[in-house]
């Protein structure tokens, strides 16, 4: 999912399309190989500026811009 000027809208769209437990491909950075994992929470807005989600086996939250549904 790409960055969005309105993170609340990004979170709402993500949560309506992808329930908790959805498999995603996560990239730590753009050149990294994707890691297949699953969401463990609904997406949330972090610090009023970034849409994030928590993933199984990953420490901390991850920006939705680093995740693609599998």
Identify the residue ranges that each predicted region occupies.
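Mixed-charge, Lys/Arg-rich low-complexity intrinsically disordered regions
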Residues: 1-20, 30
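Basic/aromatic-rich interaction segments and small domains that mediate binding to polyanionic partners
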Residues: 23-69
């Amino acid at each position: 999912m790409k960055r969005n000027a309105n993170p609340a809208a990004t979170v709402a769209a993500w949560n309506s399309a992808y329930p908790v437990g959805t498999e995603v491909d996560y990239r730590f950075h753009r050149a990294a190989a994707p890691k297949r994992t699953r969401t463990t929470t609904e997406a949330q807005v972090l610090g009023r500026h970034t849409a994030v989600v928590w993933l199984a086996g990953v420490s901390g939250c991850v920006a939705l811009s680093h995740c693609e549904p599998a």
